Amino acid sequence: MLRLARIITGRLRSIGLALGTALLLAGCSTLQLGYNQAHTLLYWWIDGYADLGDMQSARLRQDIDGLLAWHRQQELPAYAQRLRQWRTLAAQDLTAEQVCREADALRTATSRLMERGHEPLTRLALTLTPAQRDHLQRHQTKSNEGFEKDFLRGSASARLERRLERTLDRYETLYGRLTDAQVALVRQSLQASPFDPARTLAQRRERQAEMLALIGQLQAGQPRPLAASEPVPRAAGQAVLGWLQRGLFPSPTGSDAPAWVRHGCEGFAQLHNSTSPQQRRHAQDVLQGYEDDLRALTTQH
């Protein structure tokens, strides 16, 4: 994924936004290859959660095609322009307010994707069988176990080292190798972070339970099977969209932004302002490569 966005948002994304994030920030050192495989990756990601049947698979693939076509045409040019702006920002010192504004732009783009993609997810929710809902719940449990392993198991120092390793990987992809002083700065920021993994895990479980309950409610309110070509009921679609949007990370620029959101912006700005001219040029080169890839993708069909 675009490493800068991962650093800025940090823990701002919830598991419920994985689909949107994959599309919104799709990218790596081979961004074009990754984006061109997005159809397959998204399909298998959803299938892993729901164990789809043949008819569900056919309709989902069709919906993904439409979503990606819209995304390529309507969203990628805006992302490329945003990367150009980030290249300019990378050459100068940043304030936490600037970083929060950029994170808020990512949040807005995610919201647009949800508005476009909620109908296919609603259609799928209406067709899930009891066995598929059980499969979904087991997958959620497995996902939570992975979160526990990463963020809650082991001593406090071991947990910190795991977080530090992941964070440094993201920073060094953008800036190149960090100095010892910069590594110490990142460590200090993580130690002071208000991020509470136990609370986050509890919130994840609440969201997952809410999703399962919503699926049950939607199916109970659907008197007959939905035809493949039939639009989803508006009320059902709005209910799913509401669930998705409640999972968005809080607006970093809002007056009620949680402390951990503000801390993430401050931590990024602090590290960036410690970088050397060479490190900033490295960041600009990385962002230029992403921008070039996105502009090339907009011309592909």
Locate predicted features.
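C-terminal motif of bacterial Sec signal peptides marking the signal peptidase cleavage site
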Residues: A26-G27
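Short, structured motif recognition centered on aromatic/hydrophobic residues
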Residues: I46, L60, G117-L128, L136, ...
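Short, flexible domain-boundary/linker segments around small modular repeats
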Residues: A91-R107, T167-R170, P233-S255
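Acidic/His-rich structured neighborhood in mature extracellular/periplasmic domains
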Residues: C100-A184, L190-Q191
